[in-house]
Every structure is written in C-alpha cells, then in structure tokens.
Amino acid sequence: MFLKTESFEHNGVTVTLSELSALQRIEHLALMKRQAEQAESDSNRKFTVEDAIRTGAFLVAMSLWHNHPQKTQMPSMNEAVKQIEQEVLTTWPTEAISHAENVVYRLSGMYEFVVNNAPEQTEDAGPAEPVSAGKCSTVS
C-alpha cells in the first residue's frame, strides 16, 4: 500500500520487489544480530558464502511476499516467507539473489546497515587495494 516497488528482471523473468515493511526490517535486523552473536560466541564460526546466500534469499522472500500468491494462502506471514525463501533458494541463481537483495536494500533505504563504514579516502590517499573473495596467502 505505502511501500515502494520495482520490477526486477533476470534471464527474461520479471518479478516485483517491494520495500520491506517496518516489521520485516525488524525481523531482518534480528537475523543479522543473531548471526553476529553466533560469530562472536564461536570464534571458529565465520560468515560463510552459504550464510550470505541464505540471508539474501530471506530478504528477497520478505520483499516478494507483498505481491506473491502465497501471501493469502498461508496462515501467517512467517510461514509464507519461509516457503517463498525455499522457492528462491531452489529456483534462483545466486547472482539473481544478490542483485535482488541489493534492489531491496535500496528500496528500503537500508544501505547504511550493510555498507562498510570505513572513512572516505581523500584524493591524496592513492588507489585503494583491490578487493578479492579469495584467501590471502604468502607465496614463497
């Protein structure tokens, strides 16, 4: 009703993504907090690629719920979102999940929760180091 929406297209398929409602934002932030607490309590626990994909699928599912047929077929929003999340995980490629997740963050004005808060570089600072998903290692 009041939420912003945007069409999202991937491989010729278009869906409507919605801004997260206030309740959904709270649920998403609670998930992020639980993940951070788990990482702190277990020093060996790292935020994995699987965690990133599942978190993205959950966020996308919450966004899709607003215009999804499951919205009226399930007794609760949480049950419907879980089912939509499974649909996203089983039918969407990871690239689409990631791109859709970014759209939802933008629609919801939530980039401040996921953007690195590192100080901005000045022009004199020189080029930034390249970002790599691989492990750092020394070559001998």
From Swiss-Prot:
Keywords: Host cytoplasm, Late protein, Viral release from host cell, Viral tail assembly
Pfam families: Phage_TAC_2
Compartment annotation: Host cytoplasm
Entry keyword annotation includes Cell membrane: no
GO cellular component assignments: host cell cytoplasm
Disordered: annotated span: 121-140
Biological process terms in GO annotation: viral tail assembly; viral translational frameshifting
Record carries keyword Glycoprotein: no
InterPro entries attached to this UniProt entry: Tail_assembly_G, Tail_assembly_GT
Family: Belongs to the lambda-like tail assembly protein family.
Subunit text: Interacts with the tail assembly protein GT and the tape measure protein.
Role played: Promotes tail assembly by creating a scaffold for the tail tube proteins. Tail assembly proteins G and GT probably wrap the linear tape measure protein to create a tail assembly scaffold. This allows the polymerization of the tail tube protein, during which G and GT are released, therefore they are absent in the mature virion. The tail assembly protein GT is produced by a rare -1 ribosomal frameshift. The ratio of translated G/GT is about 20, and this ratio is important for proper tail assembly.
Name of the protein in its database record: Tail assembly protein G
Source species of the chain: Escherichia phage lambda
